[in-house]
Amino acid sequence: MAKQKKHPTGTIAQNKKARHDYFIEHKFEAGLVLSGWEVKSLRAGKAHLTDSYVLLKDGEAWLFGSHITPLTTASTHVIADPTRTRKLLLNKRELERVEAAVAQKGYTCVALALYWSKHLIKCEIALGKGKKEFDKRDTMRERDSNRELQRAVRNKGKEE
């Protein structure tokens, strides 16, 4: 059997929309409770985190809105639900910190990325405050100016 190629950074999926819509203040690493077909699909990179968020219920964290597309070669005796709710594994101290922050007005807990940590799949979650429309425009303007500055620095060496 041929070796499967790994993604260079170990990243499976990212939620770029969350970084655009929220001011990210603090990040956590959480484990995921997954079934076998989900792990196989994640190895193939078939996951989307757009519009996914974390809900705290009964002292546990749950990942909502994530989409893991089942492989066509997956087991037929298991009914695969691509958008099922997945339990997140956090330490008690981390859970309490997230609960306290979400209880404050304006804070939301969102999933930023799925990635490999050795042989385990981890989910990077973050506490964030929602951005207003003008904040998003300011961020885009700042990113554009940084890009222009980097381009100017790069081109300066080539002109000589």
UniProtKB/Swiss-Prot annotation:
| Record-level GO BP terms | trans-translation
The family assignment reads:
Belongs to the SmpB family.
Where in the chain are disulfide-linked cysteines found? none
Q: Is Membrane set as a keyword in this record?
A: no
- Name under which the protein is recorded: SsrA-binding protein
Q: Where is this region: Disordered?
A: 132-160
Organism lineage string:
Bacteria, Pseudomonadati, Pseudomonadota, Gammaproteobacteria, Pseudomonadales
Task: Give the domain of life.
Answer: Bacteria
Which cellular compartments is it found in? Cytoplasm
Primary localisation category: cytoplasm
Its job: Required for rescue of stalled ribosomes mediated by trans-translation. Binds to transfer-messenger RNA (tmRNA), required for stable association of tmRNA with ribosomes. tmRNA and SmpB together mimic tRNA shape, replacing the anticodon stem-loop with SmpB. tmRNA is encoded by the ssrA gene; the 2 termini fold to resemble tRNA(Ala) and it encodes a 'tag peptide', a short internal open reading frame. During trans-translation Ala-aminoacylated tmRNA acts like a tRNA, entering the A-site of stalled ribosomes, displacing the stalled mRNA.
The terms under GO molecular function for this entry are: RNA binding
Which NCBIfam families is this protein grouped with?
PRK05422.1 (NF003843), smpB (TIGR00086)
Record's GO cellular component, any one?
A: cytosol
Q: Which organism is it from?
A: Pseudomonas putida (strain ATCC 47054 / DSM 6125 / CFBP 8728 / NCIMB 11950 / KT2440)
